[in-house]
Amino acid sequence: MYQPARMGVGIRLATEDDAAAVAAIYRPYVETTRISFEESAPHDEEMALRMQSPLHPWLVAEEDGRIVGYASSSPYHRRPAYRWTVETSIYVAQGAHGRGFGRILLSRLIELLTAQGYVTAIAAIALPNPVSIMLHEKLGFVAAGTYRGVGFKLGEWTDVSLWQRDLAPRSAAPSEPLPFREVAS
């Protein structure tokens, strides 16, 4: 799956070979912001392990051969009844903000998750983050609620806003989500 998004920019499925670049993009979010609630940045090997789920795709944006952002999906919760709901995340490299990479990544991730058969996508956004909220609103997510003061990092309590997007109608007997490699073109 490689889709040109615009001249010089492409979106593709992430591979384990991308783990170092993805970890490098994520590291400043972990070390200097409350956007991620992790307190220690994962090393390359840990990032590669996170990418291994056959049901939860990761995408990367490449500009002129350099990875400038990624979008990931993960189980919303581990209990089986949640398996039609998926959590999404997007991270863009420092210096690459404001150029549409987040929008392209999240749009393509939503397309893939929909094709897999997921019914609901959830984004958990640490507040304040008006840029992320605006992006999610533009892509059809709606506010579903806010957890107040649920994370303490960098000396501050942080609220988390939950955003939800329906990907498919809710049916009485939903089909199991498909592995992403079966539907990625």
List PLM regions with ranges.
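Conserved beta-strand-loop-alpha-helix junction that forms the acyl-donor binding cleft
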Residues: H97, A123-I133
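Conserved acetyl-CoA-binding loop-helix of GNAT-fold acetyltransferases
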Residues: G98-L112, M134-K138
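Acetyl-CoA-dependent GNAT
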Residues: E39-G95, L106-S107, D166-L167
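Conserved GNAT-fold acetyl-CoA-binding loop/helix
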Residues: A23-L49
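A short beta-loop-alpha structural element at the N-terminal edge
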Residues: G10-A24
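Conserved GNAT acetyl-CoA-binding A-motif
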Residues: L113-I125
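Glycine-rich phosphate/pyrophosphate-binding loop shared by adenosine-nucleotide-utilizing enzymes
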Residues: V9, R66-Y70, T158
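Conserved catalytic-core motifs of GNAT/GCN5-like acyltransferases
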Residues: S72, I122-I125, E137, V142-D159, ...
